[in-house]
């Protein structure tokens, strides 16, 4: 349906190679995601937030806006449902939209084997692996030590990621335009440990102290790197961002009311 709506409006449809193969499209109309982001005026992503996160990392730094169409689950990042797509595209053609720049975050870690760099839109998580034992982490912000955690893990989320894993672990909901990191421990052994909010311009350092517990770094819950005792993960704001398209009249707070079933959903 989406392709026909776009063609009827006199626009050209491009798709990434994997989608082209799945749909049986001609190879001349396909490109990899990075190449596509340089050629297209708008990227349509069909799926849930997981699909949006993957695409955002792959096209990071591109100025091409992304419009997410939710055919998955909760969908905080997917702006419209499949039923709303015809109206949404009509709004796009008429210019009834705004761009939202979402900062990405980066993590760098020098393991015993190599230097690893990862990018995320939502969050980085340093956590235990498959064995259900507490990990011990030392956390610092810039040049200051924050604390040591004995916990299942630590979530360092961007403003965009505040409604993801961090929210489920008791973290605060943060407006996407707030320039902050949210540091949320997962099941900390010290009951007074709570979510901490620091500037997005800070560098958050997480040092692995545990020697007998498998520890991993996860980017957006999708890309994992094995960590060892003594490894330090440095998380900072990326110089790259992604542009999400939002229809005029919609807002982050409207999304909260609808997705979380808060009072006022019918306003």
Residue locations for each model-derived region?
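ATP/NTP phosphate-donor binding region
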Residues: 1-42, 83-98, 109-118, 248
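Short glycine-/acidic-enriched loop or helix-start segments at secondary-structure transitions
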Residues: 25, 54-56, 77-78, 136, ...
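N-terminal glycine-rich "phosphate-gripper" loop used for MgATP/nucleotide binding
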Residues: 45-49, 56-58
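Short glycine-rich anion-binding loops that position phosphate/pyrophosphate groups of nucleotides
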Residues: 49-51, 74, 160-162
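Gly/Ser-rich helix-loop-strand patches that form or flank binding pockets
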Residues: 54, 59-69
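Catalytic core of DAGKc-family lipid kinases
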Residues: 73-152
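ATP/nucleoside-binding phosphotransfer catalytic cores, i.e., glycine-rich phosphate-binding loops
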Residues: 126, 142-145, 193-267
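Gly/Ser/Thr-rich active-site loops/lids in small-molecule metabolic enzymes
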Residues: 134, 147-192
């Amino acid at each position: 349906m989406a392709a026909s709506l776009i063609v009827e409006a006199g626009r050209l449809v491009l798709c990434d190679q994997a989608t082209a193969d799945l749909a049986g499209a001609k190879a001349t109309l396909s490109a990899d995601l990075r190449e596509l982001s340089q050629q297209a005026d708008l990227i349509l992503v069909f799926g849930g937030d997981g699909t949006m996160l993957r695409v955002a990392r792959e096209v990071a730094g591109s100025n091409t806006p992304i419009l997410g169409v939710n055919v998955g689950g909760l969908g905080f990042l997917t702006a419209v449902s499949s039923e709303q797509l015809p109206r949404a595209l009509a709004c796009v053609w008429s210019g009834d939209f705004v761009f939202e720049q979402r900062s990405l975050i980066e993590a760098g870690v020098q393991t015993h084997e190599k230097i690893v760099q990862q990018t995320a839109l939502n969050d980085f998580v340093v956590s235990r692996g498959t064995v259900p034992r507490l990990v011990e982490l030392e956390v610092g912000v810039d040049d200051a030590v924050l604390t040591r955690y004995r916990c299942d893990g630590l979530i360092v989320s961007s403003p965009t990621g505040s409604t993801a894993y961090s929210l489920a672990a008791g973290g605060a909901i943060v407006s996407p335009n707030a320039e902050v990191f949210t540091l949320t421990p997962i099941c900390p052994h010290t009951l007074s440990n709570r979510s901490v909010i620091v500037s997005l311009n800070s560098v958050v350092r997480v040092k692995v102290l545990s020697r007998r517990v498998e520890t991993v770094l996860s980017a957006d819950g999708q890309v994992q790197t094995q960590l060892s005792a003594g490894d330090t993960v440095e998380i900072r704001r990326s110089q790259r961002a992604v542009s999400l398209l939002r229809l005029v009249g919609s807002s982050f707070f409207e999304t909260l009311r609808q997705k979380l079933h808060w009072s006022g959903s019918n306003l």
